[in-house]
Regions:
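Metallocofactor- and cofactor-centric catalytic cores in central/energy metabolism, strongly enriched
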Residues: 49, 65-72
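Extracellular ligand-binding/catalytic regions of CAZymes and related secreted enzymes
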Residues: 28-31, 36-46, 105-154, 173, ...
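Helical hinge/lid and interdomain linker segments adjacent to catalytic or ligand-binding clefts
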Residues: 86-89, 96-98, 157-242, 385-388
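Bacterial Sec-dependent signal peptides at the C-terminal "C-region" and cleavage site
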Residues: 15-29
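Solvent-exposed serine/threonine-rich low-complexity stretches and specific carbohydrate-binding patches
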Residues: 72-87
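Aromatic-Pro/Gly-enriched surface loop or interdomain linker
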Residues: 56-67, 114-195
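A glycine-rich, often tryptophan-bearing local segment used as a flexible ligand/cofactor-contacting loop or short
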Residues: 210-308
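Ligand-binding face of N-terminal immunoglobulin V-set domains in extracellular IgSF glycoproteins
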Residues: 40-43, 48-50, 83-114
């Protein structure tokens, strides 16, 4: 009798443990790849997840991670990847649906595959733009050196490490601002970011559609501000279609025969939107040029608050700057302001960088599309948040000062 009672108690203990600690009790399911039915989901809506798993028809645990690799939630279900007649991208059978109401705005991925964004419609101080479509397009270009029709599964891997580095920095240094996330595809819908004070771009945003560019310009012209940390920003024009669960990226006809961007063509300069382009090369530089140094030209500007030196070491390989006219005898770049039309540009700092046996200028610039528009701080350097620069306190200080400056003005 007593032995029977002991086994009953043991069974109850095991039952309580299983109910109390479901996370980790079931074996994690190994995923081959997967995708979701939306790039961006509004907080409180549900998202459908499609997964292809190594072991079929097995019950197990899927783990939800944020983009920084932290486990956020889990769900226990059976992975069944039999094809059926649904019109999603790969005809995977839906694995499960997930309600996002308890998630804060951010970038997430189930089993670290197929990232999606949870977004909020509430007014906020900062909206960070995640380069969903640009990840897809750049992954395809790196593989094939051309753009074909591709789909959402291509976005599962190879997220720009500089974007991850920026988010890690942001998490540790920015506590006082309300923050929202959107996809670059959401730039086609002005209502998704019109209520934010500052847009932040911190990655590779090479590809833009005309509506994305038009809405960005509309946002800046309304008096709102933006921080750009990118050397390839608004360079190539492309189009995309989202049909149910499939995303199609394709070249526009006007750039199908040319590797040169259309936004920087003679008739459609991106200078008028952001003041800078990656394509400004100069073949011969003064002998006193020092690569990997940044020279501050306006040390009284608020973004340099707390900095006492005029020169700082910045590792620079890929950069952008305004249209160059020449370089003076002191090695200071002179810009062709006429190409900016109504744009108002101030050079706050500049540096030289070398890549592919060419040398060119990069810098930090304050740009206004017109006298009544909002402000853009353009840090024209993809390497700003590389693993070396990230360790430098002055890189952190300048970035934080930029965010504060744009939120105050």
């Amino acid at each position: 009798m007593f032995n029977g009672l002991k086994y009953v108690k043991l069974g109850l203990v095991i039952l309580v443990y299983v109910l109390a600690f479901p996370f980790g009790y079931h074996k994690n399911i190994d995923v081959i790849d997967g995708y979701t039915n939306k790039l961006t989901v509004l907080k409180g809506d549900s998202i459908t997840v499609y997964m292809d798993c190594k072991e079929k028809n097995r019950r197990g645990q899927f783990i939800l991670y944020d983009i920084l690799g932290n486990a956020i939630d889990s769900i226990i279900t059976t992975c069944d990847t039999k094809k059926h007649s649904d019109n999603n991208a790969f005809d995977y059978k839906p694995t499960f649906c997930y309600y996002t109401g308890k998630l804060k705005s951010g970038v997430y991925a189930w089993n670290k595959s197929a990232p999606f964004i949870v977004s909020d419609v509430q007014p906020c101080d900062i909206t960070i733009v995640f380069p969903s479509l640009n990840n897809i397009a750049n992954n395809e270009l790196n593989k094939n050196n051309s753009l074909q029709t591709i789909n959402i599964q291509s976005a599962a891997d190879n997220i720009d490490s500089y974007f991850i580095n920026f988010l890690n920095w942001f998490k540790n240094n920015e506590k006082q601002h309300t923050v929202n996330f959107i996809s670059d595809a959401d730039l086609e819908d002005y209502s998704k970011f019109k209520n934010t004070k500052v847009l932040i771009f911190a990655s590779n945003y090479l590809f833009w559609t005309k509506p994305m560019k038009q809405n960005f310009d509309k946002y800046i012209q309304s008096g709102k501000n933006a921080l750009i940390i990118s050397s390839t920003f608004m360079v190539n024009e492309f189009s995309f279609n989202i049909k149910q669960w499939q995303i199609t990226l394709e070249r526009t006809q006007e750039r199908a025969s040319s590797p040169i961007n259309t936004f920087n063509s003679k008739t459609n300069k991106n200078y008028n939107s952001v003041g800078c382009s990656y394509e400004n090369h100069i073949s011969k530089l003064p002998i006193y040029n020092n690569n990997h140094f940044m020279t501050i030209q306006n040390n009284k500007h608020k973004i340099f608050t707390g900095l006492s030196q005029k020169k700082y070491i910045i590792i620079a390989y890929s950069g952008s700057c305004p249209p160059l006219k020449s370089i003076d005898e002191m090695g200071i770049p002179l810009y062709d302001f006429a190409l900016l039309q109504q744009g108002i540009l101030t050079c706050l700092a500049f540096g030289y960088r070398s890549i592919y046996e060419q040398q060119s200028i990069w810098g930090i610039y304050e740009f206004k599309q017109s006298t009544s528009s909002g402000k853009i701080i353009n840090i024209g350097l993809a390497d700003w948040f590389n693993n070396i620069n990230l360790k430098k306190k002055y890189v952190s200080d300048i970035t934080k000062n930029c965010i504060e400056y744009l939120n105050e003005n």
